[in-house]
């Protein structure tokens, strides 16, 4: 998938507004990710030099260590950037930086061993810094962001151990799950290619059932950013599942045992998948004894539609033919003579059909000869 296709699909999914809420525990690299994202994607698309310079000045500060740098939610840039696509269409994009959820060992939320009190637009009185931070993060997720990026870490980007982040990480992901907005998890590491980073990413992916991408936010490349956005596309919900199967299955009378079995399996399968990632690159087991194989034939990431082909066992076709006709049909060899015989019987019936209809209507009917049954002879004079 090309970069432009990724952006087009996300724009169609979000109605043209890609507002990415960057959330997670404090001291994980959220501001660093936003700064790098803006440098790679947003700033190059701002044509006006003055606006580009102002947007660059609005980029968040970031630093190593345990001190919290972000003090309030902030839109980056303040005004959404309109990005025109060369293939047609456009979308508006901006990111939302959050303070995040507190973790043990972080500095900046207390003063003289007491909670630091701050004024917040969501309260009419001073509240503890951590309460204001969590409230702001929730509002960003619920009211402003169209998609989410959770930034967590293996503990290598700050002077805090991995276990200090686990509780805040779990809480923020639970918030996103409750809201139902698509999101992806970034595992910020100083060495994202290490075995330890990949093992932790696999563990988190198994725990949260979401895409987890190990990455170094400081050194993130444009290709890695495209990969993150593509993974995000697969976190959008499935809107439609179209199943292709032999047309004769749909021609059976409603309530037929084969239809009931196949449709029940389809409904059960549809209830077990929710987002595009649940289907992409995976086996599609439709639990039906009459379906021999299912193949994923197409996915439209922009609309959320999935196309599947279901193959029915060949012997089922002959079994149903036998049931419907009362004839002994078990394979192609037995089918051919039956079809030939039935065709002859149909031709014979077609000759007398109109007469039979007349009999039912009037009590008698006339069978007209076909053109092939007529013979022309020399006329004879008959005297009587």
What are these regions (language model features)?
Residues 1-126, 142:
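Conserved G1/Walker A P-loop phosphate-binding module
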Residues 3-7, 12-14, 18-27, 36-40, ...:
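P-loop NTP-binding site
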Residues 105-108, 159-164, 194-198:
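Conserved ATPase-coupling elements of RecA-like P-loop NTPase cores
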Residues 164-170:
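Charged helix-capping and loop-helix junction motifs
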Residues 171-184, 189-256:
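Canonical P-loop GTPase G-domain recognition
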